[in-house]
Amino acid sequence: MNHQTLAGRRLYFVGIGGSGMSAYANAARALGADTRGWDAHETIFTDTLQGIEIDLGGDPRPPDGWEVVVSTAHAHRIAGTPRAEFLAELVAAQPAIVVAGAHGKTTTAGMIAFALRETGGDPSWIVGGVIPQLG
C-alpha cells in the first residue's frame, strides 16, 4: 500500500463521530493526510481516532486551509466533498475489495478483513459497524 497517497492534504471530516466517517479519517491518516474533524458529541467511534484532533459541538466549519469531507447527515449545514466521492478516492488509491448489497455487508467485510489480517496481510478496512475481532 502507498502510505503517502494523500500526503500534503489537510482533511477535515464533518460528522467524524460516525462509523463511516471515523473510518475514512483513519484511512486518510494512514495514507499520509493531516486529519481533523468535527462532530456534535463524542461517540464510540471517536475513541478510535487516536492522534486526530476532534472539535465537539458548536460550529462545524473547518479552520482555514482545510478541505472538507462531509457526511450526508451534515451536507445541508456545510459544503464539502460528499463522503461517497471521498470513498471513491480512497478506493482508487490502492487495491480494494468492495462489498455491496442489501444485507450482510458489515459481516462480510469484517470477515474478509479479519481473514486477510490473520493470514499475514496488512489490510485497511472501512466497515459500517463494530467488529470486535478487528479491535
What do the predicted segments below correspond to?
Residues 1-86:
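N-terminal leader/targeting and accessory segments in enzymes
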Residues 27-30, 62-64, 72, 76-135:
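Phosphate-binding loop of NTP-binding sites
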